[in-house]
Design a protein with these regions (language model features):
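Glycine-rich, basic loop-to-helix element that forms the pyrophosphate-binding segment
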Residues: 62-78, 99
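Conserved donor NDP-sugar-binding/catalytic core segment of glycosyltransferases
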Residues: 95-127
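The conserved acidic donor/metal-binding loop of glycosyltransferases
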Residues: 87-91, 116
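A conserved acidic beta->alpha catalytic loop
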Residues: 23, 38-47, 87
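Short aromatic/hydrophobic "clamp" motif used to bind/position activated sugar donors
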Residues: 83
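C-terminal subregions of glycosyltransferases and related glycan-biosynthesis enzymes
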Residues: 203-321
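Conserved nucleotide-sugar donor-binding catalytic segment
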Residues: 76, 115, 129, 133-222
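N-proximal low-complexity "stem/linker" segments adjacent to membrane-targeting elements
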Residues: 1-25
Length: 321
């Protein structure tokens, strides 16, 4: 049996899948299987996979069940001791699996090991931004405020965690299914972090019509579920958790194609009502500057300012190296 099962859910992702698969097949660690779950795609994914000669790649086709359902299918078919997830448009550094396996082999008590993640745009170009989190060991206090496992593509999970904590909740959508899963694992197992960007997360402009209320409700479900099983001594974190969730939500209208800065301001207001102390946080200051830029320059000007800042960040990073 392979040591690692790599689960890739795919829904009409053929534009990015070849590069994603290549980043897996060129891993320095070779003892793995790839379980690609074709989640009801209509873009010829099956035909493309059939042309891959590598016997480690296995295809499962199902009717569309969403990201959680596809991941759960992958988990059910996985035979590895460790399970790593990779979204169909993200990329891995060649040493990603090797370093994570070594971490789990050397630390038998660890349930999940994650890495830093670098942000790329839709065309695969670096934005210059790297998400860095340092929390490890008992991380529940940190993860209830912020999903330190920034992307599902950075996580490698010990198989027994799913046997103990259950699998992904198919009733949750709107990008919170990861957060819910990691919270449940964090309540039972320590985490480790590899402090280097071994994953490239592809950022897309979201569609114009997003149901912000549904997204907010998904956050609410996760928070209430987490605190329902948390010891009373941790309940003081609930207000801060809601506040941080609403700061996170406030970015979503600014990242959509039809940017809605008024909705962003509404989420920001709610965040500070839940937790006034967040007013002085770096995240709230960044959000305030982004909203101000939108008000000053409009939607097109805001996008140009972001592009200018990303370019400046890339040049600074190249100079620093």
């Amino acid at each position: 049996m392979p040591k690692v099962s790599v689960v890739i859910p795919a829904y009409n992702s053929l534009k990015y899948l070849p590069a994603t698969m290549e980043s897996v097949l060129r891993q320095t660690f070779n003892d793995f299987e790839v379980i690609l779950v074709n989640d009801g795609s209509s873009d010829n994914t099956e035909n493309w996979v059939s042309q891959i000669a590598d016997p480690r790649v296995k295809l499962i086709t199902q009717e569309n069940q969403g990201l959680s359902g596809a991941r759960n299918t992958g988990i059910a078919h996985a035979s590895g001791k460790y399970i790593a997830f990779l979204d169909a448009d993200d990329l891995w550094e060649p040493t990603k699996l090797e370093k994570q396996v070594l971490c789990l082999e050397e630390n038998s008590e660890i349930g999940l090991v994650y890495t830093w993640v670098a942000l790329i745009d839709e065309n695969g170009n670096s934005t210059g931004r790297v998400f860095k989190n340092y929390a490890e060991n008992d991380v529940w206090h940190q993860i209830i405020e912020h999903n330190i496992v920034e992307s599902g593509s950075v996580a490698m999970v010990r198989r027994q965690c799913f046997e103990t904590c259950g699998v992904f909740d198919r009733n949750l959508r709107s990008f919170v299914e990861d957060w819910d899963m990691w919270l449940r694992i964090a309540s039972r197992y320590p985490f480790k972090v590899l402090k280097e960007p071994l994953v490239y997360y592809r950022q897309h402009s979201t569609s114009a019509s997003r149901n912000w209320e549904a997204m907010e409700q998904s956050f609410r479900i996760v928070i209430e579920k987490a605190f329902a099983s948390a010891p009373p001594k941790l309940h003081y974190l609930k207000g801060r958790s809601y506040g941080c969730a609403h700061l996170c939500l406030a970015w979503k209208p600014l990242q959509s194609r039809n940017k809605d800065y008024k909705k962003a301001m509404d989420f920001q207001r709610q965040a500070l009502e839940y937790c006034p102390q967040l007013g002085f946080s770096k995240e709230n200051i960044r959000l305030s500057l982004a909203i101000a830029a939108f008000e000053w320059f409009g939607s097109d000007g805001y996008s140009r300012v972001l592009k200018l800042l990303y370019g400046l960040r890339r040049r600074i990073q190249r100079f620093a190296r």
